[in-house]
Amino acid sequence: MMEEENTIRPHQEIRQLTLEEKKFLLAVERGDMAGTRRMLQKAQDTEYINVNCVDPLGRTALLMAIDNENLEMVELLINYNVDTKDALLHSISEEFVEAVEVLLDHENVTFHSEGNHSWESASEDTSTFTPDITPLILAAHRDNYEIIKILLDRGAVLPMPHDVRCGCDECVQSRQEDSLRHSRSRINAYRALASPSLIALSSKDPILTAFELSWELRRLSFLEHEFKNEYQELRKQCQDFATALLDHTRTSHELEILLNHDPTGPVYEHGERMHLNRLKLAIKLRQKKFVAHSNVQQLLASIWYEGLPGFRRKNMALQAVDIIRIGIMFPIFSLAYILAPYSSIGQTMRKPFIKFICHSASYFTFLFLLMLASQRIETFIGGWFFADSSGMLNTMEELPTKRGAKPTFIEWLILAWVSGLIWSEVKQLWDVGLQEYLNDMWNVIDFVTNSLYVATVALRVVSFFQVQKEMIYNSHATDLPRERWDAWDPMLISEGLFSAANIFSSLKLVYIFSVNPHLGPLQVSLSRMVMDIMKFFFLYVLVLFAFGSGLNQLLWYYADLEKKRCPEVSPMSALLNMNGTNDPNACIVWRRFSNLFETTQTLFWAVFGLIDLDSFELDGIKIFTRFWGMLMFGTYSVINIVVLLNLLIAMMNHSYQLISERADVEWKFARSKLWISYFEEGGTCPPPFNIIPTPKSIWYAIKWMRRVFCSGSSAARREHLKTIRRKAQQASDRDFKYQQIMRNLVRRYVTVEQRKAESQGVTEDDVNEIKQDISAFRCELVEILKNSGMDTNVTAGQGGGGGGKKNRQKERRLMKGFNIAPPGSTGSLAPVAEFSTSLDNYDNQHEILSSTLSTLFTPNFMHKRQQSQAGSGGGGSESPTTPTAPQGTQGAAMTASSQVTKYNKSALKPYNKRIAGHKKRWGTLIEAAKVGNVSKMLGRSKSEDSVCNSSHTSTPVHGQMRVTYAQNSPQQEYGYHGETSSTTISTPTPTISVVSNSPAAHAGVGSHFFHTTSGLTAIAALKRKRKKFSSSKNICPVTESVAAANAAEILNDKTLKRVSSYPAAEAGVQHNPAQLVKPRRHEQTQSQHDSVETNSTFTLSIDPSNTSVNSREPLISTSCVSTTGAIG
């Protein structure tokens, strides 16, 4: 227990603020320039406060001014040389541009080359930002264009972070010291680099920068899986920025220059053939949103349908007719291009859509030939032409089935098409390179297909020469039936590979159909599902191998017994057959579990229900072995069929959902890749015409040889120099046009973003800024009035603070100390040490208030106060705020005391019931009263049904009774009397006195009246509506009920009138003890009742002579006189 008491908790390590420091921070929070300037000047002279002190939330005065966006206060604090530390980072975080400029100017004055920046000197434990955060990084995180431009103009730089696999000394040391900080610093750096504003301001080519950064972030997301989501979000941000720039292109000329820009190529001129280098780069870096943008797609569509004007406006039937016509004529187009490539029909062949139709028609012809080969069309043709010759017909039927047979006419055509397909793939591999070639999955499929065809041709050649070699020793080697061939005969293997190649060739149609808007999205979904199937297949093979190994180990012996019973395999089959033990099904059953491969096949087909339990009825198998084998088979079926297959279905469904959500973007991206592949210069002729040498190819070969062998001549050198100068000029023109368009796009983008920011509705920050301006204006106005010689004690008293619930909360926490309570505190609101001395001056009053405020009005307490007044001999009281009663009114005072005694119990009983229902509100008030922060609690509610008639003013006559509660407190400074964190409230001293009927004592005094029909009715109403009765906030709910009951019994023929539940003071109240206060306006709003001066005098006046015409109850007037200030 002692250890817990002596433990220093984290919230106690902060140094406790003094009263003056709290006043200083509160003045800064409210925007009081004059008060803050006086305090700073005094602190500069006497150092009575620490101007760099922090509030319980760790904010210095400068940070509070930045949070409130008070530029004048920021300049004032900087002029008095407060520590800035990370104030620049805070101002950037708040996007306070003016403060950023002021702090940067201050930084230029105070920074030395050998020292650190101000934000680097802040403690890592208490600083809001990590050490790797610089002003430029933070501004980029906020994406504030204006602040980023200010920092870049002043020379701020943001270096590229090192690679994630970097092995330099700096990276190695950083990873060893703190790997988490090293990774987070890289993320912070990339988050800044991905800022659209920073890219627009610092890059000459923002689109290229966004592309490269997006690709780098994609790579990092695969390398650092722990931060994959963060990198993916930044990648998406870069893609959105590049797409947003594309939104602002207005003409086709701008779009063409943008998409055809090549940093190393010639300048693009309008009307030339588009090479679309920038768009190809976007496809390479997988910028799907950029490629699928409507502007890009419109340009691509215009290029795609360039050869067929009006094609898109035709109906579907006419479009089909045009496509079929061009497809049928593809040999004519191909031959025309070979013979005359620059003729009109040859140029038509170069149009992308015409080229696509010709290539598709060529591929459909190839598939038709494959179908003819699989159907052995030569046999049918032979049957047509040689139906009369049976010998010739048999020869033609047997020719394809013989070993080493020569290729048929259809197979020769297929070989020509395969040669053309291989040549086109070789040319593509030469143009784009191996890495780029392998990035496209369809290229991999084409490579596998062509490899199968090449292997088929090679095996056919091997089989042919093998048979020719055998015919030397056996002339009937080719007549051997197929069923007697060797199992691994090259002819059989070639047929298997050829059939597999046919499958891949047919699947290539899916790629061609991607141009269709209906089949294209399905093709994209299929490609995504293939990846899921491959992931699932890895797990499936693992389970399949595990159970296959187990079952083969368990059943291999009994499978061998079944094998011996098979007449086709066992040498004893004839003997077994004679004995009658031969089983024809044994030839099938023994293969089920004979080896690991056969067992694995058995389990695979079991997934489709093709294996039954009869396979476990082996020869000689025992009961336990059969049961154990069937149990393993059942477990495999549950795992594979119930679990894994449903998992595959769920994975494929998830993939389809992902694709369907962005099906349009995915399909347009895939279609754009296909379109651009036909925009290239080469590969114009389709297979098999592409293997025919053309005159253009011969001319290109001659030029290449001339350039290689004649490059050393003087003419070649002169031509080379001209080429260099021409390329330099072209590069200058290219860069000028591109940069001009890029500047326009960036300007439009920034303009639109600023308009979006300005068009946003009113936010909480805007409201807080208005509140801060009003608070600062109020403080400035009070200071002006004070300098003009006016009494501003009332106006500058407690005030309403900065305004608003949050500002009041900040001020309350500041004055209470919030989380810096001493260890010995047990209450909900701990007493503050520096105010404990104020308790010594008011011991008696604090004892009375210690339990509950209602004890102020007990009979004994009231009797003691009467005796004290009687002992004074009727003279004036020493207290200036407590006038004594004249001698002639002592009887009335004693009567009031007796009535208080009489009604005390009856009034306290219902009050105790009521206070239970309002325990929360009064508990808050009492706790707040303990720390002297009553001002924020007293103006929270207002009686909605009370009426204050300020026109009813009357002069009290002789004999009027007044109950006065006066309290004193130490002198308070700077007009923040109600916001101090004092631990006690000075207890009011109740005095019952009779006010004389002197005119001088009541000149200019107004009263508020309570209205009710009778004394008892008034008491009941006060009990029911005590929550709305205002005097209960100032003193105690019992006081008014007791006083009202007292007045009702003494003068039951007078009228009892009510006033507003909470009277507010006016600015012109004078502190004359001989007079009552002037009447106060009841129309004040709730914001005017935020706080009340605790050093006030409450006066209850009972005038038995001043009654209304129709009233039988006495008039009761109340007033509240402030000794140091009025209600703010």
From Swiss-Prot:
Record key words, sorted: ANK repeat, Calcium, Calcium channel, Calcium transport, Cell membrane, Cell projection, Ion channel, Ion transport, Membrane, Repeat, Sensory transduction, Transmembrane, Transmembrane helix, Transport, Vision
DNA-binding in keyword set: no
SMART domains membership: ANK, TRP_2
Residue ranges of the region described as Disordered: 865-898, 1064-1111
N-terminal signal peptide: none
InterPro entries the UniProt entry points to: Ankyrin_rpt, Ankyrin_rpt-contain_sf, Ion_trans_dom, TRP_dom, TRPC_channel
Stretches of the chain found on the membrane's Extracellular side: 347-403, 466-492, 557-629
Cytoplasmic side: 1-325, 425-444, 514-535, 651-1128
Xref: SUPFAM superfamilies: Ankyrin repeat
Any GO CC annotation of this UniProt entry: rhabdomere
Pfam families: Ank, Ank_2, Ion_trans, TRP_2
Bias (Low complexity): 878-893
ANK repeat locations: 57-86, 131-160
Transmembrane regions listed in the UniProt entry: 326-346, 404-424, 445-465, 493-513, 536-556, 630-650
Gene3D superfamilies for this protein: Ankyrin repeat-containing domain (1.25.40.20)
Distribution of this protein across tissues and organs: Expressed predominantly in the rhabdomeres of photoreceptor cells.
GO molecular function: calcium channel activity; inositol 1,4,5 trisphosphate binding; mechanosensitive monoatomic ion channel activity; monoatomic cation channel activity; store-operated calcium channel activity
Biological role: A light-sensitive calcium channel that is required for inositide-mediated Ca(2+) entry in the retina during phospholipase C (PLC)-mediated phototransduction. Forms a regulated cation channel when heteromultimerized with trpl.
Subunit structure: Interacts preferentially with trpl and interacts to a lower extent with trp.
Family: Belongs to the transient receptor (TC 1.A.4) family. STrpC subfamily.
Protein name per UniProt: Transient receptor potential-gamma protein
Organism: Drosophila melanogaster (Fruit fly)
Source species taxonomy: Eukaryota, Metazoa, Ecdysozoa, Arthropoda, Hexapoda
Gene coding for it: Trpgamma
